[in-house]
Amino acid sequence: MQAEDRSQFGSAAEMLSEQTAALGTGWESMNVQLDGAEPQVERGSQEERPWRTVPGPLEHLCCDLEEEPQSLQEKAQSAPWVPAIPQEGNTGDWEMAAALLAAGSQGLVTIKDVSLCFSQEEWRSLDPSQTDFYGEYVMQENCGIVVSLRFPIPKLDMLSQLEGGEEQWVPDPQDLEERDILRVTYTGDGSEHEGDTPELEAEPPRMLSSVSEDTVLWNPEHDESWDSMPSSSRGMLLGPPFLQEDSFSNLLCSTEMDSLLRPHTCPQCGKQFVWGSHLARHQQTHTGERPYSCLKCEKTFGRRHHLIRHQKTHLHDKTSRCSECGKNFRCNSHLASHQRVHAEGKSCKGQEVGESPGTRKRQRAPPVPKCHVCTECGKSFGRRHHLVRHWLTHTGEKPFQCPRCEKSFGRKHHLDRHLLTHQGQSPRNSWDRGTSVF
């Protein structure tokens, strides 16, 4: 069956090539020679369906509906497709038809080879579903046939690089400088505007390396029909997201503090403050208010940290007070030394007139009352331990005894001096050197 179809197609192609060589007036005569019985198609129907099959010897391939689906499918793939012949003649259309016939004479032409041979007006008239169907057949293996039909396909250099195993095409920065690069700005509502800001210049789109080698990536700069093509036929482009210069000003306005826009001003001196608490603290200097007071001494302060610093002075209460001058002291020993000063002052007041303080001998403080009295001799002492030590002289008791020679002593320092003799040291030398037995 396929051999018969090829022979029929070859005879039809030879006859059609001879007839096209003799044509010189219009496309109507060519339609009559191809099929004299075929009615002329209206202009409106040609725009709706730009492609149709060639009637004639291959007409039985699509008319036999009783055959098996598989055989019908094989016949449909082998059937040649030619463009609908327009009413008016055009030199470009003649060249496309001649190239199509030359390609068909070499072998069967499938729908995949010529599925994208549309003009720009015809491509725009297709539905999105049709453009998706035809667009996916723009492959590397079919580019040669499509180019032979003079269909404009960009990025032919990339196809040669793909065949040689080179990297995909990346735009040259020098070429991009010659082009008018749109500079867009972001207004916050999703709209784009042209601008002269060099920092926001859009970078040229680059192709992803993960795109298949059989897919031709289209660029809107080379074809006006880019807007009408579906997203699946446009290829994959990579570019940075567009920044908009107004977004920086909007971001700044949103982050500015309301207090900076409406500062707090002092009505008296005109000073401005960021925070209202700072203004309230400043106004205390004008009113003289002291809201912080000490609970112990009832002192008032204008700052809280001043009150905290003052409260540290109350941690150590000064209970020792001098009865003469009213001074407070933390220790009683300090009070006793202070009272000696008052005693010396009183003695100085009682000195004779004309006697200078330098010639006056220093007088001791008044003696401590001797309340501890010895019952044997009636001697009195100011300290109790002095009385105990004196009592030993009456009893003859010697409580301090040497552990080596069992000698006893009435005073402890006498025993310490005796122990130095057992060590071979002189008590005088040991005391001079400041050494001790223990």
Curated annotation (Swiss-Prot):
Q: Name one GO cellular component term.
A: cytosol
Q: Which Gene3D superfamilies match?
A: 6.10.140.140, Classic Zinc Finger
Please list the residue ranges that the record marks as compositionally biased, kind Polar residues.
17-32, 422-438
Protein location: Nucleus
Q: Does the keyword Hydrolase apply?
A: no
Residue ranges, compositional bias (Basic and acidic residues): 40-51
Q: Which UniProt keywords apply?
A: DNA-binding, Metal-binding, Nucleus, Phosphoprotein, Repeat, Transcription, Transcription regulation, Zinc, Zinc-finger
Domain KRAB, residue spans? 109-181
Q: Does Electron transport appear among the keywords?
A: no
Q: Where are the zinc fingers (C2H2-type)?
A: 264-286, 292-314, 320-342, 372-394, 400-422
Residues modified to Phosphoserine: 191, 426
List, in alphabetical order, the Gene Ontology terms for molecular function in this entry.
Answer: DNA-binding transcription factor activity, RNA polymerase II-specific; RNA polymerase II transcription regulatory region sequence-specific DNA binding; zinc ion binding
| Expressed in which tissues | Highly expressed in skeletal muscle, moderate expression in heart, liver, and pancreas, lower expression in placenta, no expression seen in brain, lung, and kidney.
Map out region (Disordered) in residue numbers: 1-53, 345-367, 418-438
The record's region (Transactivation) falls at 171-265
Q: Biological process GO terms, please? A: regulation of transcription by RNA polymerase II
Q: What family does this belong to?
A: Belongs to the krueppel C2H2-type zinc-finger protein family.
Query: What role does it play?
Result: Transcriptional activator. Activates transcriptional activities of SRE and AP-1.
Q: What name appears for this protein in its UniProt entry? A: Zinc finger protein 641
What is the organism of origin for this protein? Homo sapiens (Human)
Gene coding for it? ZNF641
